[in-house]
Regions:
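A short His-aromatic
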Residues: 101-105
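Conserved N-terminal segment of class I S-adenosyl-L-methionine
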Residues: 1-92, 96, 100, 244-255
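S-adenosyl-L-methionine-dependent methyltransferase catalytic module, highlighting the catalytic core
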Residues: 2-12, 39, 85, 107-115, ...
Length: 258
């Protein structure tokens, strides 16, 4: 059976939560820190924003180059190979910085946010996505280079320690991701991902966002009939009821740069 890249339900929920967050935040330019294959950058470019994606994984940037080829060709988007922590202070100034499933890989998370803050204009916004709930630490965290998971209060505190204001933290994908959590772990275990436990944290991190795991990140092409934004719309409505709870195994933090 041939498998192709199709976003799983949790990714659709994450993307919809980002759309919800953007409704209250203006801006025309963005920086995607740890852009991976570029799927969230594409969402922002589709919405008319102009941006830059940064990642230290050459393989991830190859995928992002293909994903965002039309926007790259017309100058609406560009890619930068490298670690954001090594970029100069004058690298860019944008209205919005996003970073999804990156900060949990970084030892100094407050310093990470302060670095990103340098690239956001005063009055601009930062949106951070991280694995939620410490009690959900699992094999998957140990194979993709995670250092920690965040309870809702943890993420709120880190954003405030970075001297950001108008802080808000949402639980994302509840109950969809929660219900699929153990199934997802089973798929990870049977895929051979456990072999990555012998890799360095950086090696694990480089491939964390571009894994091909059958029935988790890749599916038979016919599954598009089920996994699409239209058919999954009821899940988006339901997740909004849980944004202000601490139940999410994915947390999204939003804050303003003073």
């Amino acid at each position: 059976m041939k498998f192709v890249k199709i976003d799983p339900p949790g990714t659709f929920c994450t993307q919809e939560a980002l759309r919800d967050a953007l409704k209250d935040r203006g801006g025309q330019t963005f920086l995607d820190v740890g852009c991976g294959g570029g799927h969230l950058s594409k969402l922002l470019c589709d919405a008319g924003l102009t941006g830059i994606g940064v990642d230290f994984s050459e393989r991830a940037l190859e995928i992002a180059s293909a994903t965002l080829a039309p926007y790259i060709q017309k100058g609406q988007y560009r890619l930068q190979l490298g670690d954001v922590l090594d970029l100069p202070a004058d690298f860019t100034k944008v209205d919005l910085a996003i970073s999804y499933m990156v900060m949990e890989h970084v030892e100094d998370d407050v310093g990470f946010l302060q670095k990103i803050k340098q690239y956001v204009k005063p009055g601009g916004h930062i949106i951070i996505g991280v694995p939620g709930r410490r009690d959900r630490w699992s094999l998957e965290d140990e194979t993709v280079g995670h250092i920690r998971r965040y309870d809702r209060g943890d993420l709120d505190a880190v954003l405030r320690k970075a001297n950001l204001d108008q802080v808000s933290v949402w639980s994302v994908g509840v109950p969809t991701i929660n219900m699929l959590f153990n199934v997802s772990l089973w798929m990870v275990a049977r895929s051979g991902e456990a072999a990555k436990m012998g890799q360095s944290q950086r090696e694990q991190t480089e491939t964390s966002g571009i894994r091909d795991i059958p029935w988790k990140t890749v599916f038979p092409s016919w599954v598009r009939i089920i996994l699409n934004r239209t058919t999954l719309y009821p899940l988006f409505v339901i997740q909004r009821m849980f944004y202000r709870t601490g139940l999410g195994v994915v947390m999204m933090g939003m804050a303003r740069v003073p």
